[in-house]
């Protein structure tokens, strides 16, 4: 057991999907995994291990924001030996070419957070995805016919930002979307020498405000990113 995860050693696979919403973790376990067993209910942050196409895979919620995903991802890596971590979550488009329900693969993650600068105050340490996972995910998504964008995202500490126009400006610099976790996940992956990737479904748009989705859709649909994430985890 770790401080925030109740699993015993061996109950978590070395490959894991990380949705922010614990109910999305439950949905993935019930709809994609065979013989799924719940290994964590602490703070209702549900975690499950089962098999996908014969491969042992886990899924666990992380909550919202970089402090929360940092807690769970670090414990999964350090205490349970997880080697491949793929975040599957939602993001808001910052680019007019990126639309609701399309996928974004975060090649890198800019951030307004101090989560990295606390460790490296004199450097701008780049948060980048595992190229192996990114390459596999991109080709899998294309083979499945999914509209997929690859590029930089913004990982923000603030959901209700007072810097809305600044965020919009980033879209003009090629930033695809804004979310709240990828930079912290990539930083931990670099620190502990594991592979990480963030796959997001666009749930709303900051540049096309008429495009949006419901809370129920965000919890129970967006299955394309789940399929891509699982296929990427088991790809040789």
UniProtKB/Swiss-Prot annotation:
GO cellular component: cytosol
Coiled-coil residue windows: none
Principal EC category: transferase
Catalysed reaction equations from the record: a purine D-ribonucleoside + phosphate = a purine nucleobase + alpha-D-ribose 1-phosphate; a purine 2'-deoxy-D-ribonucleoside + phosphate = a purine nucleobase + 2-deoxy-alpha-D-ribose 1-phosphate
Binding site for a purine D-ribonucleoside: 4, 179-181, 203-204
Active site: 204 (proton donor)
Site (Important for catalytic activity): 218
GO molecular function: purine-nucleoside phosphorylase activity
A biological process from GO: purine nucleoside catabolic process
Keywords, alphabetical: Glycosyltransferase, Transferase
Lineage: superkingdom: Bacteria
Binding site for phosphate: 20, 24, 43, 87-90
EC number of the protein: 2.4.2.1
Family designation: Belongs to the PNP/UDP phosphorylase family.
Subunit and interaction comment: Homohexamer; trimer of homodimers.
The protein's role, per its UniProt record: Catalyzes the reversible phosphorolytic breakdown of the N-glycosidic bond in the beta-(deoxy)ribonucleoside molecules, with the formation of the corresponding free purine bases and pentose-1-phosphate.
Protein name: Purine nucleoside phosphorylase DeoD-type
Originating organism: Streptococcus pneumoniae (strain JJA)
Gene field: deoD
